């Protein structure tokens, strides 16, 4: 079975390593190079550059970059149809009289390309049209050669397993989503059902940080690289197809991950605002500071930022009497690390340190890098917005897409890390399903704990008591 090198091998210190596969200079027109780097090309020429022949196999960085960015210009099934056509016609796979030796030379290369596509962008093949074309081309390669037949079978079985795992994951997400209810509703109907706070479920902040890392890595793992591009898909001005392109905007796993960040922030705020006694609220704040600190040590920056966001929500930050009982030195250090000034300079420095540690890791724990996800999306958004997809001559601006692919492939390396910590089902269940307060309910709980300080807060408190509790 053709093996693809790991994502970390795609780059050298200067950026893209174009020498992983020795390839001849492209003979078809429509591609523009500078210093041996591909900068732009017509869409047609770029598609041809993707297709191997007897003497040529595209560099892996090119394959990843083009498969990632091409969806801004055409549907993956349209690209697959073109690739199949070029393979069949140019390599004469459909001709029974074609040279068997030539087919033996080209077949492993086409199979390698299909393997790279199915391994890196498996979600493309949820589309029946993609799967049909894949099986058709694979069948042509495999006919008459037992070795290729086994390899094709292995590739398709591996793809089907990945798609089945994705469907299962989506079912679990849907189940979690349908069972999560507003905490205030539960409190009013079954007050005894959620007496347990997070410290009762998990008294050790280090263990909680590890369980948060489990959730983060599982959710990261299911995000397809294409979702970063599909999140910003817009109609290509040179595309004459007037049909809706929303089909390309499939980002459900990315959205589920952003929702998890929001849930964790609200969970932190809920756990802090819930206790009636001031000392219990202060203890809860100190507990989450320790959890956040351990997240930082692990390299789990997403949970760290979600916890800080929860503690900085107005209903929590206004609890001045509670905060007065908290030793905040450790929290101040964490806030400094995630300070948004200078475009998150401190965080980016820490992230680079974690990424470097991951590259030279001696243990699976040292490999963990979980970026602050909203900032990663923002960076990719600004990269996408800051440069045109096409140049004035209609060429695809490939220089932009090298940079996009570089950012996404780094993420791909991080998301493939196995979580080394033991799973605790009880803690995970609590983190994922315990009801949390809405923003209004958080404010109400906050005012009930420490009364309103001015007329605006008093009016809001009365309004919330009336609307949420039915009291005046």
Curated annotation (Swiss-Prot):
Sequence ranges assigned to domain N-terminal Ras-GEF in this UniProt record: 34-164
Record-linked InterPro entries: Ras-like_GEF, Ras-like_Gua-exchang_fac_N, Ras_G-nucl-exch_fac_CS, Ras_GEF_dom_sf, RASGEF_cat_dom, RASGEF_cat_dom_sf
Keyword Thylakoid part of the UniProt annotation: no
Compartments (UniProt record): Early endosome; Late endosome; Midbody
Keywords of the record: Endosome, Guanine-nucleotide releasing factor
Role summary: Guanine nucleotide exchange factor (GEF) with specificity for RAP2A, it doesn't seems to activate other Ras family proteins (in vitro).
Subunit annotation: Interacts with CCDC124 during cytokinesis. Interacts with Ras family proteins.
Protein name, entry field: Ras-GEF domain-containing family member 1B
Organism: Bos taurus (Bovine)
């Amino acid at each position: 079975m053709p093996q693809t090198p790991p994502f970390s091998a795609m780059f050298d210190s200067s950026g893209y390593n174009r020498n992983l596969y020795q390839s001849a200079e492209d003979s078809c027109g429509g591609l523009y190079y500078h210093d041996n780097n591909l900068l732009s090309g017509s869409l047609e020429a770029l598609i041809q550059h993707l297709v191997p022949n007897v003497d040529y196999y595209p560099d892996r960085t090119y394959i990843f970059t083009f498969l990632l960015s091409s969806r801004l210009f055409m549907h993956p099934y349209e690209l697959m149809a073109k690739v199949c056509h070029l393979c069949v016609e140019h390599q004469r796979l459909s001709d029974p009289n074609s040279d068997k030796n030539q087919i033996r030379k080209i077949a492993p290369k086409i199979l390698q390309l299909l393997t790279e596509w199915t391994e890196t962008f498996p979600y493309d093949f949820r589309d029946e049209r993609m799967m049909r074309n894949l099986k058709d081309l694979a069948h042509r390669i495999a006919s008459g050669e037992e070795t290729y037949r086994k390899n094709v079978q292995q590739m398709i079985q591996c793809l089907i397993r990945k798609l089945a795992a994705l469907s299962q994951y989506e079912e679990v997400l849907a189940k979690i989503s349908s069972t999560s209810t507003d905490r205030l509703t539960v409190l009013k109907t079954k007050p005894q059902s959620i007496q347990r706070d997070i410290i009762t479920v998990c008294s050790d902040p280090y263990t909680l940080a590890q369980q948060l890392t489990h959730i983060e890595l599982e959710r990261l793992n299911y995000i397809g690289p294409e979702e970063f591009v599909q999140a910003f898909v817009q109609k290509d001005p040179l595309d004459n197809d007037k049909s809706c392109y929303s089909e390309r905007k499939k980002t459900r796993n990315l959205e589920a991950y952003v929702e998890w960040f929001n849930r964790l922030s609200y969970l932190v705020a809920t756990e802090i605002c819930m206790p009636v006694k001031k000392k219990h609220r202060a203890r809860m704040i100190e507990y989450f500071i320790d959890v956040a600190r351990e997240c930082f040590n692990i390299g789990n920056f997403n949970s760290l930022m979600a916890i800080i966001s929860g503690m900085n929500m107005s209903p929590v930050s206004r609890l001045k009497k509670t905060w007065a009982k908290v030793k905040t030195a450790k929290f101040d250090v964490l806030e400094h690390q995630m300070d948004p000034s200078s475009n998150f300079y401190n965080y980016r420095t820490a992230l680079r340190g974690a990424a470097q540690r991951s590259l030279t890791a001696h243990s699976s724990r040292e490999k963990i890098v979980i970026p602050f996800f909203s900032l990663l999306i923002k960076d990719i958004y600004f990269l996408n917005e800051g440069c045109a997809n096409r140049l004035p001559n209609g060429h695809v601006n490939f220089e932009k897409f090298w940079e996009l692919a570089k950012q996404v492939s780094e993420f791909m390396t991080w998301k493939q890390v196995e979580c080394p910590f033991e799973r605790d089902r009880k803690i995970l269940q609590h983190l994922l399903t315990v009801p949390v307060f809405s923003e209004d309910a958080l404010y109400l709980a906050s005012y009930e704990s420490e009364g309103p300080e001015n007329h605006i807060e008093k009016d809001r408190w009365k309004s919330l008591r009336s609307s949420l509790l039915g009291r005046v």
